[in-house]
């Protein structure tokens, strides 16, 4: 749960008549996402005179590990055949378009692209020396899947 945007007022010496807070919520499971969404929607004001409105809700399902394991194991086999080190895996609670595909029952792998760090930040970077092997892995995985 990360408060990512806050907008209020237009001068430093005036109490704003409106404040808007946007919150980014990511989760490893739909149950956790629903629990946090419910907790936020049931928040009560500390000041009885305060007026507030809570709108919105989650805009994508989580990418649950159970929906990715079979395809991950296949990618790990292909990586081993290419002589790559063992593929890592992580549940990150991220938000990609793959979340929708996985929720619809498709097998999804996320994170097969460039290797780097600082995702979505000003200091984001890509290790270009990894692009060739990552491309080879993706190419070999697609060929393996097409051979079924």
Provide a role label for each language-model segment.
Residues 1-148:
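Metal-dependent amide/peptide-bond hydrolase catalytic core
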């Amino acid at each position: 749960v990360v408060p990512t945007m806050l907008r209020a007022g237009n001068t430093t010496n005036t109490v704003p008549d409106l404040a808007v807070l946007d919150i980014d919520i990511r989760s490893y499971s739909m149950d956790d996402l629903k629990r946090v969404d419910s907790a936020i929607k049931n928040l009560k004001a500390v000041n009885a005179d305060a007026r507030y409105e809570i709108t919105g809700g989650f805009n994508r399902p989580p990418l649950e590990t159970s929906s990715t394991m079979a395809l991950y194991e296949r990618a790990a086999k292909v990586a081993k055949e290419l002589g790559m080190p063992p593929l890592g895996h992580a549940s990150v609670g991220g938000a990609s378009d793959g979340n929708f595909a996985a929720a619809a029952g498709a097998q999804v792998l996320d994170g097969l692209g460039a290797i780097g760090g600082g995702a979505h930040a000003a200091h984001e970077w890509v290790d270009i020396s990894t692009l060739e092997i990552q491309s080879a892995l993706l190419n070999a995985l697609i060929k393996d899947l097409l051979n079924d």
